[in-house]
């Protein structure tokens, strides 16, 4: 794999650390705890010195116990060759490591001090909560290094599972490195002893909520309102009964109705709220022009709360929007819909996918896992009125939303169908008309079931968008066996500062 240079976002600033860096990490509250005897031993144990030799696929440092390794108490360990996965450590560094979890085949730990050879790509994390909060795990590493590492993960998995490398590596797709996340679920818990509410992500490897005042990964419309949300919830009579906030944000479009605010929060309340509590929420949300929803039970119980007398509650949800200006498209969605969390990367991703398919006017395209039309509609623009796009999606609600978005954007060369794609659907009328190109954007589990019947579509070109490089590599092997060649592959930094790898690959049918 050739090294690549990624673009630098103006929203990201990094500071170089000192020659040594102390990282203060609170005791880890593990979900699956070792025995009480082991817990006491780990808690009392002194940090141990290790040389960091490499990185795991999730971005943790990897070290190995050497022969005759001497622990701090002078005892010579018998763990020769045992691996330790070390959070916050980078290759080449010497670190003092606090062991937090010990298992038969490996151990886990935190780097509490970099004692020598700090990696030149190490930076000071921009967020004050980094190391405690589990929302991200790579802020100590330059973003450019992160994305190159993610490409190396993809390359390794393609070789390991499919014994292949692409003909061409794509330039990594990068966008905003901070303030990019427009969808999330934040936990809520009121702590009576501190007389305050906690709002945010869970601590690393724990069910406990991290004590946050702000979040640098969330869109700043919410990320810098966390302290205000904590204060608000602390004043409610039902502060002990608020369990979660589900947030969704769209883009602000001046031409849209005033009632369609670009920020929506669903408050998961475990018991009905009093009128006084609802009034407090309404005042807070109205001041920020946010949509307010309450959810006392399942998804069907979500109820929008009117903030003014003019609010139209004839439908369960207000609308949110995002755009793909390259294709003159505006998408409408509701807060519970699946959408990509990074709008700037999504714009680049859709264009890249369309470019890779190299469509011509009049061609037929199949879009599997089409959602609300994020790829289908740009593809429809490219094939023109003489071409067509068929979108297939498991969710009937999303299928309806996609058709609505097509109609709203004046697109009439698309068809959308709701179908369980884990079963062979090639006997359906829409499936047997032949396709020139195919786009697939499956969930993390990949598209193994589809690989079994995909040859029946007889597509010349395939673009596969993946949120899990392991399943992409597995499915790549199946495509190679079916007569396709991997022409292009690359990664997209949809979740910067995390170990999450979003990738894209193009396949071309080999001529007989």
UniProtKB/Swiss-Prot annotation:
Keyword check for Kinase: no
Alphabetical keyword list: 4Fe-4S, Iron, Iron-sulfur, Metal-binding, Methyltransferase, rRNA processing, S-adenosyl-L-methionine, Transferase
Binding annotation for [4Fe-4S] cluster: 127, 133, 136, 215
Gene Ontology terms: biological process: rRNA base methylation
Biased segments, Polar residues type: 15-25
Top-level taxon: Bacteria
EC number: 2.1.1.190
Basic residues composition-biased segments: 28-42
Region spans: Disordered: 1-45
Binding positions for S-adenosyl-L-methionine per the UniProt entry: 340, 369, 374, 393, 420, 441
Pfam family, one: tRNA_U5-meth_tr
Molecular function as annotated in GO: 4 iron, 4 sulfur cluster binding; iron ion binding; RNA binding; rRNA (uridine-C5-)-methyltransferase activity
UniProt xrefs under Gene3D superfamilies: 2.40.50.1070, Nucleic acid-binding proteins, Vaccinia Virus protein VP39
Active site positions, chain numbering: 467 (nucleophile)
Domain TRAM span(s) in chain numbering: 41-113
Role: Catalyzes the formation of 5-methyl-uridine at position 1939 (m5U1939) in 23S rRNA.
Name recorded for this polypeptide: 23S rRNA (uracil(1939)-C(5))-methyltransferase RlmD
Protein source organism: Psychrobacter arcticus (strain DSM 17307 / VKM B-2377 / 273-4)
Gene name tied to this protein: rlmD
């Amino acid at each position: 794999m050739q090294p690549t240079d990624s673009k630098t976002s103006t929203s990201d600033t990094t500071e170089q650390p000192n020659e040594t860096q102390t990282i203060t990490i609170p005791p880890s509250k593990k979900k699956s705890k070792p025995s009480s005897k082991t817990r006491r031993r780990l808690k009392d144990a002194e940090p141990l010195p290790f040389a960091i030799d490499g990185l795991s696929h999730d971005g943790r440092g990897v070290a190995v116990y050497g022969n005759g390794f001497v622990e701090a108490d002078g005892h010579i360990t018998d763990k020769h060759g045992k691996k330790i996965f070390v959070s916050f450590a980078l290759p080449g560094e010497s670190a003092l490591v606090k062991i937090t979890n010990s298992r038969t085949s490996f151990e886990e730990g935190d780097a509490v001090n970099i004692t020598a050879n700090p990696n030149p790509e190490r930076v000071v994390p921009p967020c004050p909560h980094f190391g405690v909060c589990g929302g991200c795990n790579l802020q100590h590493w330059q973003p450019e290094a992160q994305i190159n590492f993610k490409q190396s993960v993809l390359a390794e998995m393609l070789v390991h599972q499919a014994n292949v490398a692409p003909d061409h590596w794509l330039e990594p797709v990068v966008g905003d490195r901070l303030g990019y996340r427009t969808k999330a679920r934040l936990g809520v818990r009121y702590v009576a002893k501190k007389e305050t509410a906690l709002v945010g992500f869970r601590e690393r490897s724990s069910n406990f909520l991290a004590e946050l005042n702000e979040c640098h990964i969330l869109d700043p419309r919410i990320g810098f309102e966390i302290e205000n949300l904590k204060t608000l919830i602390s004043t409610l009579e039902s502060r002990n009964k608020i369990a979660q906030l589900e947030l969704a944000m769209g883009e602000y479009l001046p031409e849209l109705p005033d009632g369609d605010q670009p920020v929506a929060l669903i408050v998961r309340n475990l018991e009905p709220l009093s009128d006084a509590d609802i009034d407090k929420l309404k005042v807070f949300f109205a001041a920020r022009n946010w949509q307010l929803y309450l959810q006392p039970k399942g998804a069907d119980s979500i109820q929008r709360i009117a903030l003014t007398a003019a609010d139209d509650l004839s439908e369960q949800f207000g609308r949110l929007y995002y755009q793909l200006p390259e294709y003159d498209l505006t998408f409408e969605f509701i807060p519970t819909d699946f959408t990509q969390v990074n709008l700037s990367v999504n714009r680049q991703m859709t264009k890249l996918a369309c470019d890779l398919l190299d469509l011509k006017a009049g061609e037929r395209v199949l879009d599997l896992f089409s959602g609300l039309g994020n790829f289908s509609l740009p593809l429809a623009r490219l094939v023109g009125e003489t071409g067509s796009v068929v979108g297939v999606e498991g969710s009937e609600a999303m299928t309806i939303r996609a058709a609505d978005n097509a109609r709203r954007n004046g697109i009439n060369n698309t068809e959308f169908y709701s179908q369980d794609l884990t079963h062979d659907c090639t006997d359906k009328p829409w499936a047997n008309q032949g396709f020139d190109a195919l786009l697939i954007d499956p969930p993390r589990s990949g598209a193994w079931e589809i690989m079994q019947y995909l040859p029946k579509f007889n597509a010349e070109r395939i673009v596969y968008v993946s949120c899990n490089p392991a399943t992409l590599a597995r499915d790549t092997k199946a495509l190679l066996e079916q007569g396709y060649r991997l022409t292009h592959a690359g990664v997209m930094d949809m979740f910067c500062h995390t170990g999450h790898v979003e990738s894209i690959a193009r396949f071309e049918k080999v001529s007989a």
